[in-house]
């Protein structure tokens, strides 16, 4: 009697799964194989997809090899021009316009390796999208589809005539025919959709699949009239104190003020914990900084408790921290749910190196909060436009800049650059500085500040781009509301669109981390 067959020797494994960061290089290689005449994804594009909408990025893996993939984002399609381009709908491929509350999934690419195009890989990827649309209760899936065989007929018929013949099955088009077979219906034909697509003569068919399981919400989720975020900026006075408890009392007072105003964020200045030097009685600046690092746990414990107690997210200024024998200038985000994040200062001023021996960090971070994505760029860092652009591309809508400057010239560098970053990146920026003086403390003798909240410059925002600002050089707070929904709409339809209109064909910023 023959032995029972070992069926595992015959098995082949096909998996449709979400894309992970380890797959990115393989996805780029796959695109080169699928579309040899078109510019492939850049790594930063695919990383941005995973940061903004990881659930919408799928790949087909066969025997350990990635042989197909698809990418998508969520939008409210009513907010876009019918004659949009691929660049418009994807924010130049970065999908930073992804709207988690959107009613429509927009598919921006599907590709299958040429060797595997008889295995219904495209159909499987489309089904994964449809399953996700049902799970998220989306109204429809919309795609801008290529018509890659049109160039063969372009001299004898218009794009509309070609599409009509494909729809009537008189001409076969590998993309449009496939989409029709998968339940998509034609909405319109868009010219100049994808400049690199010479096979389609730059045309695309706008197609839609309607989710028959969609349940309309009682509220009109597709139109969000406002997304207000209230920010309380503390312009903190540096004056002599006699204990950490006295410092804690002052801090709690301001957090209480922010909470009473129902603020979403309370923002403290850079290295305002150097106020502790006033009772440490250490004359050497470098030794005084080392003494301050001994209060790191007390500082973190204090702000964590206050964020939870007063139900407000706190940008805890910044604090000197010793790690592995080096001292860093670190800004902390204390979320009101009790979690903590940190951002190292990346650019160290000559003064910080000379007096305190501060070391530089090496990562630009963007943090999720209950009020959207934010970034923190400490003082000098806001003077380097590359960092703000990287943060904006990672999805940040607000950049907080705690600062500490001793004179008006230093302050104006921070202010002017902060306002410039707001315009360049169509984001809100916030600066919070120290005032007063510490006469017996080396290198912290005098302070100058006028803190503020800044917006882009367009009709939807404050006339002069200033949401609110303090009076110069006195201890006080300023409280202002910023609207992330207005910001989102302005990025799509503003008088100018700095993010969309970048010339990526002649320059780009590469983040090396």
UniProtKB/Swiss-Prot annotation:
Note the superkingdom of the native organism: Bacteria
The record's keywords, sorted A to Z, are: Hydrolase
Q: What class of enzyme is it?
A: hydrolase
**InterPro entries of this UniProt entry?**
Acyl_CoA_acyltransferase, C-N_Hydrolase, C-N_Hydrolase_sf, GNAT_dom, UPF0012_CS
Q: What happens when the gene is disrupted?
A: No visible growth phenotype.
Checking SUPFAM superfamilies in the record gives:
Acyl-CoA N-acyltransferases (Nat), Carbon-nitrogen hydrolase
Among Pfam families, the record links this protein to:
Acetyltransf_1, CN_hydrolase
Enzyme Commission identifier(s)? 3.5.-.-
N-acetyltransferase domain location: 14-212
Name the Gene Ontology molecular function terms of this record: acyltransferase activity, transferring groups other than amino-acyl groups; hydrolase activity
- What Gene3D superfamilies does the record point to? 3.40.630.30, Carbon-nitrogen hydrolase (3.60.110.10)
Catalytic residue list: 270 (proton acceptor), 345 (proton donor), 379 (nucleophile)
Q: To which protein family does this belong?
A: Belongs to the carbon-nitrogen hydrolase superfamily. NIT1/NIT2 family.
Q: What is this protein called?
A: Probable hydrolase YhcX
Source organism (scientific name): Bacillus subtilis (strain 168)
């Amino acid at each position: 009697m023959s032995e029972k067959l070992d069926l595992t020797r015959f098995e082949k494994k096909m998996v449709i799964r979400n894309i992970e960061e380890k797959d990115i290089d393989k996805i780029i290689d796959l695109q080169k194989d699928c579309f040899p005449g078109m510019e492939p994804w850049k790594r930063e594009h695919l990383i941005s997809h995973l940061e903004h909408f990881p659930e919408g990025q799928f790949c087909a893996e066969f025997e350990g090899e990635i042989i197909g993939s698809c990418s998508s984002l969520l939008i409210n399609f009513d907010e876009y021009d019918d004659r949009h381009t691929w660049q418009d709908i994807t924010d130049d491929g970065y999908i930073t316009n992804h709207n988690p509350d959107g009613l429509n999934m927009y598919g921006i690419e599907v590709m299958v390796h040429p060797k595997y195009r008889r295995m219904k890989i495209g159909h499987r990827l489309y089904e994964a999208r449809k399953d996700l649309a049902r799970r998220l209760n989306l109204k429809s899936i919309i795609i801008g589809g290529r018509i890659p065989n049109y160039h063969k007929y372009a001299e004898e018929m218009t794009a509309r005539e070609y599409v009509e013949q494909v729809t009537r099955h008189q001409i076969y088009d590998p993309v449009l025919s496939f989409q029709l077979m998968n339940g998509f219906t034609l909405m319109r034909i868009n010219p100049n959709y994808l400049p690199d697509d010479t096979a389609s003569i730059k045309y695309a068919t706008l197609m839609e699949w309607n989710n028959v399981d969609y349940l309309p919400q009682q509220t009109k989720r597709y139109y969000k009239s406002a997304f207000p975020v209230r920010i309380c900026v503390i312009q903190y006075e540096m004056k002599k104190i006699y204990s950490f408890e006295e410092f804690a009392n002052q801090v709690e007072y301001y957090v209480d003020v922010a909470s009473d105003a129902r603020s979403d964020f309370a923002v403290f200045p850079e290295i305002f914990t150097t106020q502790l030097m006033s009772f440490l009685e250490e004359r050497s600046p470098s030794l005084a900084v080392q003494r301050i690092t001994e209060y790191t746990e007390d500082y973190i414990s204090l702000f964590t408790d206050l964020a939870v107690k007063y139900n407000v997210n706190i940008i805890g200024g910044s604090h000197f921290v010793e790690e592995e024998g080096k001292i860093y200038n670190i800004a902390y985000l204390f979320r009101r749910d009790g979690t903590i994040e940190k951002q190292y200062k990346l650019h160290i001023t000559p003064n910080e190196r000379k007096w305190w021996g501060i070391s530089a960090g090496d990562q630009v971070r963007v943090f999720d909060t209950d009020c959207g994505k934010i970034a923190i760029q400490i003082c000098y860092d806001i003077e380097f436009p590359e960092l703000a652009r990287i943060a904006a591309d990672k999805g940040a809508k607000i950049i907080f800049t705690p600062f500490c400057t001793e004179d008006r010239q230093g302050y104006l560098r921070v202010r002017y650059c902060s306002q410039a970053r707001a315009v360049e990146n169509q984001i809100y920026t916030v600066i919070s500085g120290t005032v007063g003086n510490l006469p017996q403390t080396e290198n912290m003798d005098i302070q100058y500040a006028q803190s503020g909240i800044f917006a882009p410059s367009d009709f939807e925002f404050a006339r002069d781009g200033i949401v609110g600002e303090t009076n110069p050089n006195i201890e006080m707070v300023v409280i202002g509301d910023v609207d992330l929904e207005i910001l989102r709409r302005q990025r799509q339809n503003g008088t100018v669109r700095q993010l969309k209109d970048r010339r990526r064909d002649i320059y780009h910023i590469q983040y090396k981390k």
